[in-house]
């Protein structure tokens, strides 16, 4: 029996919960964006954050009531340690949480099926469904942002293991004598390949007198990438330096998982013509030849869509029958 999902009459809300804000997006079941809003969430306790988040979602629903037909799911993605089965959050990098039962709170408030997931792992799944890795079953996505993390897709599914969290690639040690990481160890990849670390490295070099197109008062990842694209030697050298360390770590992951494709995400990919060759150079010298041959390293196609990872969790629930059963019953 062939079943085709009716995409127009059913809607889902995807939420990307960041450290200081939330992006809330209304999707139809084809992944088309119908509406999107950004809400500041400066709260610093679990209780106040939950209250503010649920109110923001309620406000969003009220604002777009005319566009909503039947809301069948709400999905939230966020940084931290998430148990997708229980719907509980055990750790977030910016506030203290303790067994935060977010799914339970969402379902109690909105009376629909709800999901919660890790932001980077969910983005990897979204790339598999809608983006750069649609053409393969095994892929690794690495995202550079405030930190560095990975999402592993194996046989078309998120690889998470019994404990529910894998892919903390940012805490592989790449420089034993390097800077102290917020995790307590020294020389983690994240101390080199994260936006703040990249900006600080360029800023330090500028203060030492090195010449660059990057202005001292606007030393951001955006201006660094723009300068690298224009051939600025300092910006290019820093991006290459980051790329080499990413490449070393990705080579380890390749030797472990033998993926069909590597996807790189984050603002740093704006300098992809400098970054990707540096990554590939390390892969070519440090990954097994049989594993690296014909292995594409590409940019994310969905990095600009904040909440698409949240919708990927809804798509997965459609495919595995959880939401499909709901649709058939209605």
Which role fits each region the language model picked out?
Residues 2, 12-16, 71-75, 139-143, ...:
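Short glycine-aspartate micro-motif
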Residues 36-38, 44-49, 98, 105-226, ...:
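Glycine/GP-enriched mid-protein hinge/lid loop-to-helix segment characteristic of carbohydrate kinases
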Residues 28, 84, 153:
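Short, acidic, Ser/Thr-enriched surface-loop or helix-capping motifs
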Residues 79-82, 146-147, 268:
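Short glycine-rich anion-binding loops that position phosphate/pyrophosphate groups of nucleotides
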Residues 33-138, 274-285:
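Glycine-rich phosphate-binding loop and adjoining helix at the ATP-binding site
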Residues 2-70, 177, 189-330:
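ATP-binding/phosphotransfer module of carbohydrate and carboxylate kinases, centering on a glycine-rich
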